Amino acid sequence: MAYANSGRHFRNDSVEMKQFRCTQMALSDCFLQTHSEYGLSTYDTHSDGSGVSVSSRLRPVLNLRPRGRVWGLVADTHITSWLEHAGHSFDVVTDEELHAEGVEVLDGYRVLVTGTHPEYHTTEMLDGLDAWLQRGGRMIYSGANGFYWRIAYHAEKPGVIECRKTEGGTRSWVSE
């Protein structure tokens, strides 16, 4: 959810110079630029320049859809398509399920294939994954920037995360 409705690359004056190309916007990008009520991503900043640290799946997320940009969900569907084509059955376990249920959600599985960008994690997620690996589970890491930033799920509101980027690393804003 960290990238949900991200628009920072459209609000950055120097992005085209950094990327050496013109910005291309999909209709959903144009819509998000004019409809702030759908919220920002944790890569965006508020109008006062402070970073957005909270995101939620409990809102329309317009950049998380099939046939969108080859990023996140769309890239992950390449993995599921490959598994289907190869005749392998699979289940999808979300980060939120791993956070809430820990190692128990992975019990019974021999192999875990990560998504293409497993960047954000909680202590509970890492503990569950580590316990499962210690029990003999095997993991295929198919991503980049994996296990990079720490997040916290809201205790009373499922689907809400907070991300404070205080450690060293590449980021669009620095947490206080």
Which residue stretches match the model-derived regions?
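Short, low-complexity, polar/charged sequence segments that are solvent-exposed and flexible
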Residues: H9, F20, L112, A131-L133, ...
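Short, surface-exposed, polar/charged, turn-prone segments marking secondary-structure boundaries
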Residues: F20, Y141-S142, E167-R171
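Extended catalytic-interface subdomain
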Residues: W149-E176
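Helical hinge/lid and interdomain linker segments adjacent to catalytic or ligand-binding clefts
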Residues: G68-A155
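Aromatic-Pro/Gly-enriched surface loop or interdomain linker
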Residues: M1-L106
